[in-house]
Amino acid sequence: MLNVSGLWAEYQGKPALQDVSLQIASGQLVVVLGPSGCGKTTLLNLIAGFMTPSAGVITLDNIPVSGPSAERGVVFQNEGLLPWRDVVSNVEFGLQLAGMSKEQRRVTALKMLNRVGLAGFEHHFIWQLSGGMRQRVGIARALAVDPRLLLLDEPFGALDAFTREQMQELLLTIWRDTGKQILLITHDIEEAVFLASELLLLSPGPGQVVERLSLNFGQRYAEGEPCRAIKSDPEFIARREDVLGKVFQQREVLI
């Protein structure tokens, strides 16, 4: 279980987060939603171990987070892939750093590429792939080291609407099949409502958790209900509009 308690943080000398607490249990997909500048990415970087909080505690399975670790796989908004490596060797990169044998990391990387729908593209270079395919490589690379927690920082924000929905479906399929703890950062309200088993709404910066919502639309997809049927369901539309209203309410506080 991920446990974040009483987290305070600064970014570039300014307050970014104030007293943020959250938990992610095994099999839970938590989405953090908020406007630009609310500290969403700072929160993810703290959990990933890339930054140190001003105050508060972060633990994963009761072990304090003190720096980056293979226990926490990260998928970046800009993919963070190595252009001089082909697809399969990008996926192998973390395994290579961990000291896995060449044969075993190739087997693992090919398995992950198959999981994300990229079988047959292992020897393509990154510049030969579409944006959605590059994000699939990023997800495969993060999963290859078998992390306890998967962290995704606005991974689908630069994709077109059709590809974004495909990637949302892929993420829910991975969540269903692996049972991993997942934390996703987004500013897209429909995406947040569709994916989250728990949705945390952050206030404009410095970010504080102002709403916690339990949702089941992602679970419905994982159980076989089509994405389009879910997103056109009046219940989904009503919840999306409710969250939109809460977001606008937070923005109006600043005016």
UniProtKB/Swiss-Prot annotation:
Q: Report the membrane topology from the UniProt record.
A: Peripheral membrane protein
Q: What is the main EC category here? A: translocase
User: Which keywords are on file for this protein?
Assistant: ATP-binding, Cell inner membrane, Cell membrane, Membrane, Nucleotide-binding, Translocase, Transport
Q: What's a single GO CC term here?
A: plasma membrane
Pfam name, any one: ABC_tran
Organism listed in the record: Yersinia pestis
Compartments, record wording: Cell inner membrane
* Sequence ranges assigned to domain ABC transporter in this UniProt record: 2-229
Q: What does this protein do?
A: Part of the ABC transporter complex TauABC involved in taurine import. Responsible for energy coupling to the transport system.
Signal peptide range equals none
What quaternary arrangement does the UniProt entry report? The complex is composed of two ATP-binding proteins (TauB), two transmembrane proteins (TauC) and a solute-binding protein (TauA).
**GO molecular function list:** ABC-type taurine transporter transporter activity; ATP binding; ATP hydrolysis activity
Q: Which family does it belong to?
A: Belongs to the ABC transporter superfamily. Taurine importer (TC 3.A.1.17.1) family.
Q: Which PROSITE patterns does the entry link to?
A: ABC_TRANSPORTER_1, ABC_TRANSPORTER_2, TAUB
Per UniProt, where does ATP bind? G34, P35, S36, G37, C38, G39, K40, T41
Protein name, entry field: Taurine import ATP-binding protein TauB
EC number of this enzyme: 7.6.2.7
